[in-house]
């Protein structure tokens, strides 16, 4: 590419992100990118700008030293691409990003005045828990085509189809009736039997007598778009809907190649063409997902014999085994019983050398496994329990609940919690059609951008680690392992699955094929 054209495109790319290059920085970049083809230029410039934005910038004027550091970081990440094929990311290793309303971008924790998270959170952590959930949904909703301000000079019909969000403070400051308003807020029950709508500016009592609820499971502590009118200090709701979802590609178009997901990669793995190529070429890759692996049940261990014998000619990439790992939780002998059960599973795995040597085993603890209560995120099973198993099965990882798995360019979230029943029990208004609960459930999770949109007394969360339960940007695969009936639902380019309870569902499990992004329902019957 001609140097002048390359220089022009480089300067334009930085200007689009609100950055200006010093002449020395422009010259350095033009020389560094001289050998890059026109097809690769846009991708490489995007990565360099992302690396620049990660640095603490004093102004939008970019010096040569900043650009040099960014290019060096990108060069290292290119060399490390092959190491990024498969990564398991525990909840406590997930990076935290905080949305800055003034700059309209997500900043890493290190570039903010927030303290590092701790298990023993402060009162500020609890307040910020809800504030951050609100802020993420607010910025996402504001960008939706229905809520973006109409373009000056656009047709009246187009302007008429736009909506404007109001704050509760605006309503409370009005002395007369305010009709036809839409408010984004959280449903709360500040007084017994009376529901309120809350946002960062205030609270207002709700009148639900005439409210129509769109599809979804509307629980306390979930965020809604409430449409109605305000009169006499009461918001009379006509309709409730959830904040609109957006595909991962749309989120990344706004925020660039930030690695929200976690893992060793500096930028989002979606940007790596080598990983995409590996993913497409490896058509035999598969993930076997099983939940409620009751290792103390002889029948369950027998079924694993059958499963491993079937898969041994073509071992899966990974077995994802979710708890509970005992059928009878608690008790003074639970820890020793679990150690013995894991020893039995290791014996079975060692009988199949092809699986033992090439498949990975990921263990996600369940709500009734030994641990520190039922607060999320849950740490892995204790090392004292798993030490012998890990020595015998080297490719095994005992991780947190929830956890994340990155395979090539695909992002997978695993969460083991009996969530469907909890959400149904805590609904403000149960859906009129209970036939399609999985669809309602999946829509709720993705719209809320959170794995557990429930009150903290129903589903406790470590306040400072609430960000680890985010489902934003939307992953490629969301596994919510629940004792509810197995299901597979696609929403917003995200595949959401529940493998069901292995012993309770007739030994059903799911198999995910990353290259085609398909899920296969499987069952061990008649063996």
UniProtKB/Swiss-Prot annotation:
Keywords: DNA replication, DNA-binding, Nucleus. One of its GO terms (cellular component) is epsilon DNA polymerase complex. Pfam families: DNA_pol_E_B (PF04042), Dpoe2NT (PF12213). GO terms for biological process: DNA-templated DNA replication. Its main location: nucleus. InterPro entries: DNA_pol_a/d/e_bsu, DNA_pol_e_bsu_N, POLE2. It is found in: Nucleus. GO terms for molecular function: DNA binding. Transmembrane segments: none annotated. Component of the DNA polymerase epsilon complex consisting of four subunits: the catalytic subunit POLE and the accessory subunits POLE2, POLE3 and POLE4. Accessory component of the DNA polymerase epsilon complex. Participates in DNA repair and in chromosomal DNA replication. PANTHER family: DNA POLYMERASE EPSILON SUBUNIT 2, DNA POLYMERASE EPSILON SUBUNIT B. In eukaryotes there are five DNA polymerases: alpha, beta, gamma, delta, and epsilon which are responsible for different reactions of DNA synthesis. This is DNA polymerase epsilon subunit 2. It comes from Mus musculus. The lineage of its organism: Eukaryota, Metazoa, Chordata, Craniata, Vertebrata.
């Amino acid at each position: 590419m001609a140097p002048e054209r390359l220089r022009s495109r480089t300067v334009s790319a930085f200007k689009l992100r609100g950055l200006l290059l010093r002449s020395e920085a422009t010259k350095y970049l033009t020389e560094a990118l001289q050998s890059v083809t026109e097809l690769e230029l846009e991708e490489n410039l995007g990565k360099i700008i992302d690396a620049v934005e990660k640095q603490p910038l004093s102004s939008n004027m970019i010096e040569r030293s900043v650009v040099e550091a960014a290019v060096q970081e990108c060069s290292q990440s290119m060399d490390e691409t092959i190491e990024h094929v498969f990564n398991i990311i525990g909840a406590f290793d997930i990076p935290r990003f905080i949305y800055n309303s003034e700059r309209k971008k997500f900043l890493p924790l290190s570039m903010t005045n927030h303290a590092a998270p701790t298990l023993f959170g402060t009162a500020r952590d609890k307040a910020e828990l809800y504030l951050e959930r609100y802020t993420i949904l607010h910025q996402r909703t504001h960008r939706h085509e229905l809520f973006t301000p109409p373009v000056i000079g656009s047709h009246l019909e187009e302007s008429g189809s736009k909506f404007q969000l109001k704050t509760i403070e605006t309503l409370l400051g009005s002395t007369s009736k305010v009709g036809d308003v839409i408010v984004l807020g959280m449903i709360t029950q500040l007084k017994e039997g009376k529901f309120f709508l809350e946002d960062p500016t205030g609270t207002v009592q709700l009148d639900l007598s005439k409210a129509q609820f769109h599809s979804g499971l509307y629980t306390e502590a979930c965020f809604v778009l409430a449409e109605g009118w305000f009169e006499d200090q009461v918001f009379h709701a006509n309709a409730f809907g959830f904040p609109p979802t957006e595909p991962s590609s749309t989120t990344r178009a706004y925020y660039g190649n930030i690695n929200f997901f976690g893992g060793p990669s500096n930028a989002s793995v979606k940007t790596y063409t080598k990983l995409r190529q590996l993913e497409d070429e490896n058509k035999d890759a598969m993930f076997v997902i099983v939940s409620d692996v009751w290792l103390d049940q002889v029948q369950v261990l027998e079924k694993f014999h059958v499963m491993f014998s079937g898969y041994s000619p073509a071992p899966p990439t990974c077995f994802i085994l979710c708890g509970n790992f005992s059928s009878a939780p608690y008790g003074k002998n639970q820890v020793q019983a679990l150690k013995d059960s894991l020893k039995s599973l290791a014996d079975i795995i060692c009988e199949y050398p092809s699986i033992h040597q090439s498949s990975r085993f990921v263990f996600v603890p369940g709500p009734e496994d030994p641990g520190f209560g039922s607060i999320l995120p849950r740490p892995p099973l204790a090392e004292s329990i798993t030490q012998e198993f890990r020595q015998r099965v080297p490719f095994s990882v005992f991780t947190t609940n929830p956890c994340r798995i990155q395979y090539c360019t695909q992002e997978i979230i695993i969460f083991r919690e009996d969530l469907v029943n909890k959400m149904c029990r805590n609904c403000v208004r149960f859906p009129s059609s209970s036939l399609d609960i999985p669809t309602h459930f999946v829509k709720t999770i993705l719209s809320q951008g959170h794995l557990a949109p429930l009150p903290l007394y129903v589903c406790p969360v470590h306040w400072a680690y609430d960000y680890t339960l985010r489902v934003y940007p939307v992953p490629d695969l969301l596994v919510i392992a629940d004792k509810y009936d197995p299901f597979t639902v696609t929403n917003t380019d995200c595949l959401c699955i529940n493998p069901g309870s292995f012993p309770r569902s007739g030994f059903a499990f799911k198999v995910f094929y990353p290259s085609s992004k398909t899920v296969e329902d499987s069952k061990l019957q008649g063996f």
